[in-house]
């Protein structure tokens, strides 16, 4: 910063610089799934497999890839990515989107719905996607709506 600025001007310039950096970061999170994951999960450490999954999910989001099956060993974040963070990211990109979350049990599907719904209410999410709001009457974890007409519905296919 230029030393020709008085302290008040320096403070104002610094605040503007920080705001511009935040806007740039938010735009990156809106466009890049892995950047979004890092913004919502600061402790996350990306491995090679995470980058591959994120790229494939981005291709699903763009409509370039119509079907995707993720087969990996347990505890490799496939559920965190595909069933929790990806629906939240997609809802942020398109708040009028309708999402059906299907798992082998209703309990598991509703749990993902609860996590996703709670994320949409967090300040860190609202910084990236400020236009996304839950509908006022959305109380259930397994079936909720956005104020833009989007919907999330959790269903179990086994029980």
PLM feature spans:
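Alpha-helix boundary/capping segments in eukaryotic regulatory proteins
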Residues: 76-82, 92-98, 103
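Post-Walker A helix-loop "phosphate-sensing" segment adjacent to the P-loop in P-loop NTPases
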Residues: 89-98, 121-125
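Contiguous, well-ordered alpha-helical segments that form the cores/surfaces of helical PPI scaffolds
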Residues: 55-58, 80-92
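N-terminal accessory segments
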Residues: 1-66
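Walker A/P-loop
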Residues: 64-85
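Residue-level preference for the first positions of well-ordered beta-strands
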Residues: 67-69, 98-100, 151
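Conserved nucleotide-state-sensing and coupling region of NTP-binding domains
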Residues: 102-153, 158
């Amino acid at each position: 910063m230029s030393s020709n600025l008085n302290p008040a001007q320096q403070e104002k310039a610094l605040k503007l610089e920080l705001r511009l950096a935040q806007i740039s970061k938010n735009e990156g999170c809106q466009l890049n799934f892995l950047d979004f994951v890092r913004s919502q999960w600061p402790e996350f450490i990306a491995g090679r497999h995470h980058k591959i999954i994120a790229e494939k999910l981005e291709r699903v989001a763009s409509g370039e890839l119509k079907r995707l099956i993720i087969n990996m060993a347990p505890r490799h974040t496939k559920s965190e990515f595909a069933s929790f963070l990806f629906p939240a990211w997609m809802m942020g990109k398109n708040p009028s989107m309708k999402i059906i979350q299907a798992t082998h049990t209703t309990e598991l599907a509703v749990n993902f719905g609860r996590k996703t719904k709670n994320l949409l209410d967090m300040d860190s999410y609202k910084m990236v996607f400020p236009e996304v709001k839950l509908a006022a009457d959305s109380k259930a974890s397994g079936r909720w709506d956005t104020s833009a007409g989007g919907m999330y519905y959790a269903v179990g296919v086994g029980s």
